[in-house]
A protein has these predicted regions:
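A conserved pocket-lining segment of Rossmann-fold NAD(P)-dependent short-chain dehydrogenase/reductase
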Residues: 63, 168-186, 190, 194-197
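Glycine-rich "substrate-gating" loop/helix at the edge of Rossmann-like oxidoreductase active sites
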Residues: 152-159, 178-189, 211
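N-terminal Rossmann NAD(P)H-binding glycine-rich loop of SDR-like oxidoreductase domains
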Residues: 4-21
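Conserved Rossmann-fold NAD(P)-dependent oxidoreductase catalytic core, especially the SDR/UDP-sugar
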Residues: 79-124, 147
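NAD(P)H-binding glycine-rich loop region in Rossmannoid oxidoreductase-like domains
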Residues: 37-87, 101-104
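Short alpha-helix in the Rossmann-fold core of NAD(P)-dependent oxidoreductases
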Residues: 71-78, 94, 128-129, 184
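Catalytic helix-loop patch of NAD(P)-dependent Rossmann-fold dehydrogenases
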Residues: 72, 107-154, 175
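Mid/C-terminal beta-alpha module of Rossmann-like enzyme folds, strongest
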Residues: 194-252, 281-291
Length: 291
């Protein structure tokens, strides 16, 4: 029996991880705790083998004046909770970092992450995550494993990220550019299985899980349109507009540039692919607008 405490109650990732682990109650006992106002200090950490830390401020293109808050929550709070966990006998601390520690691509050049690629954040969200990682590694020892996950974009039912926006567009536009690309993505159930395997195998280190298949914006649009019975014409005639739009609209590079981990970085001695990419898009909610 592995006793797991999730710090960050009611988060999209935390809630899904909890549900996934609780499918096997004979193997996992899971509790959650809020990290607001030091409520987490009231939890008895001595009961737990693993802390899965998901609390943090998300990447939402924040204003510069919010930078101190990002460092306080994403870096300082993370390290404080990890120290507390170590002092109270927790054996493994799993931290949800982000692929954005490498770079937040803002042009059509995109970014391809190799095993040799070094982190180089270009905004304070990525830097706050990287500084948290560095602080955690200083705490690692033989009796306290640090597991850092740098996921690409996570999605799934109930998530309000960019994918539901793209779904809305796919069901409204009559035409779409045939601009194919490669993007690493991670369905929340594949992430949940990955976290489960980290706990079972008691693995420390830095990890780069992703879906077994790269996402392609064109194919995502095609699948959404098909599922919702919407006819759409995908044509290369619109491709020049992608280049033009990328110069003025930040959303265009996010939608059409390449952004992925090479596959070898995401291969481990266990299988965590529980849902295919095409199946993972079925039944996803779409937004009522692009906002």
């Amino acid at each position: 029996m592995q006793r797991v405490l999730i710090t960050g109650a009611n988060s999209f990732v935390g809630t899904n991880i909890e549900k996934w682990l609780m499918k096997e109650p004979e193997k996992f006992a899971v509790d959650t705790v809020d990290t607001m106002n030091e409520v987490w200090k009231k939890a008895d950490f001595t009961k737990y083998d693993v802390v899965f830390h998901v609390a943090g401020i998300a990447h939402v293109d924040p204003k510069p004046e919010l930078a101190p808050l990002y460092y306080k929550v994403n870096r300082d709070l993370t390290i404080e909770i990890a120290k507390w966990a170590k002092e109270h006998g927790v054996k493994q601390f799993i931290y949800m970092s982000s692929r954005i520690v490498y770079h937040a691509s803002k042009s059509m050049k995109g970014n391809i992450t190799l095993p040799t690629t070094q982190p180089n954040p270009n905004d304070f969200y990525g830097d706050s995550k990287l500084q948290a990682e560095n602080g955690l590694r200083e705490l690692e020892c033989d009796t306290f494993k640090i597991s850092i996950i740098r996921p690409p974009m996570i999605y799934g039912k109930g998530n309000k990220g960019n994918l539901p926006r793209l779904g809305w567009l796919a069901t409204k536009t009559p035409v779409f550019p045939a601009w194919h690309n490669k993007r690493s993505m991670l369905h929340v159930n594949n992430l949940a299985e990955f976290v489960k395997q980290l706990i079972i195998h008691k693995m420390g280190g830095t990890f780069y899980p992703q879906n077994s298949e790269y996402a392609d914006t064109v194919e995502i649009v095609r699948l959404f349109a098909k599922e919702h019975g919407h006819r759409i014409w995908i044509t290369r005639l619109l491709n020049p507009l992608v280049w033009l739009g990328a110069k003025f609209l930040p959303a265009v590079p996010k939608m059409f540039s390449d952004s992925y981990y090479v596959k070898e970085m995401s291969q481990y001695p266990f299988d965590y692919q529980v849902v295919s990419f095409e199946d993972s898009l079925k039944g996803l909610e779409i937004r009522k607008s692009m906002r």
